[in-house]
């Protein structure tokens, strides 16, 4: 059975989600539609990309992922269908694709499929659903549009020198854990076995990496590398972002 996932910033109180599902089922009744999340903050492309990037490979190859965050089409932000790692994505190129693809090779096209209505404010229902079904039915990208090179994201990358790494909070999850843009690979590369101090929130420091949240007593802060591969700052059984006064883009620095 074909699988189509949905990710959006619509929430669950309006008609948008069921309308899109209805459109998909009308075109392909025998399909499994999976909600990744509809609770992304409005227009928060970065968070949507982080969520999808960290779960899409757990789905079977051939799954189609519909990205419905900031979908309005323009000459700068075209509607695009993309294939990477044997998964398909349909959405608007507002840099969400480059955040998901990262350094992986991909194939992309600008969608040249007419939608069935004259309304252009609900492209996910009127166009993306149609393209997602086409991909689920095995239609090649070459029949959906012309080749396209996705836009590069201008997201801040960690800077580093011989004695420090300077990063920031990239994402805050439902537990208020602070996920940074510092990868474990970069940390180990620059650390080179040296002692280190992680500084954050203006006055807090950590001098070790934990394996789990339970490595420290309740209400103490800690640092670990999660399954996503990034440095994470958390408080055992509590909310790090709120209690530490931190937010996305807050600085996190590591000194050696």
Predicted features by range, described:
Residues 15, 19, 28, 43, ...:
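Conserved active-site and cofactor/substrate-binding residues in soluble primary-metabolism enzymes
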Residues 117-182, 190-191:
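Anionic-ligand-binding alpha/beta catalytic cores of soluble enzymes and soluble regulatory domains
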Residues 179-245:
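A conserved acidic, glycine/proline-rich C-terminal tail/linker
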């Amino acid at each position: 059975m074909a699988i189509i996932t949905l990710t959006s910033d619509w929430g669950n109180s309006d008609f948008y989600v069921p309308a899109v599902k209805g459109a998909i089922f009308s075109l392909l009744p025998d399909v499994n539609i999976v909600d990744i999340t509809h609770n992304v903050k409005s227009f928060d492309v970065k968070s949507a990309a982080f969520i999808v990037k960290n779960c899409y490979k757990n789905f079977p190859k051939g799954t189609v992922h519909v990205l419905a965050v900031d979908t309005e089409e323009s000459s700068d932000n075209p509607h695009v269908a993309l294939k990477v790692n044997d998964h398909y994505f349909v959405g608007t190129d507002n840099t969400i694709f480059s955040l998901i693809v990262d350094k992986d090779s991909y194939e992309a096209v600008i969608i040249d499929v007419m939608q069935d209505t004259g309304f252009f404010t609900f492209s996910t229902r009127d166009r993306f659903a149609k393209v997602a079904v086409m991909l689920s039915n095995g239609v090649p990208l070459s029949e959906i549009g012309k080749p396209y090179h996705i836009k590069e994201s201008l997201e801040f990358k960690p800077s580093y020198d011989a004695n420090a790494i300077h990063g920031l909070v990239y994402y805050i999850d439902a537990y208020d854990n602070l996920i940074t843009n510092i990868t474990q690979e970069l940390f180990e590369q620059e650390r080179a076995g040296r002692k280190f101090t992680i500084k954050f929130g203006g006055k807090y420091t950590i001098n070790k990496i934990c394996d789990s949240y339970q490595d420290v007593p309740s209400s103490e802060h800690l640092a670990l590398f999660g399954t996503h591969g990034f440095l994470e700052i958390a408080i055992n059984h509590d909310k790090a972002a709120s209690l530490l006064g931190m937010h996305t883009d807050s600085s996190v620095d590591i000194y050696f």
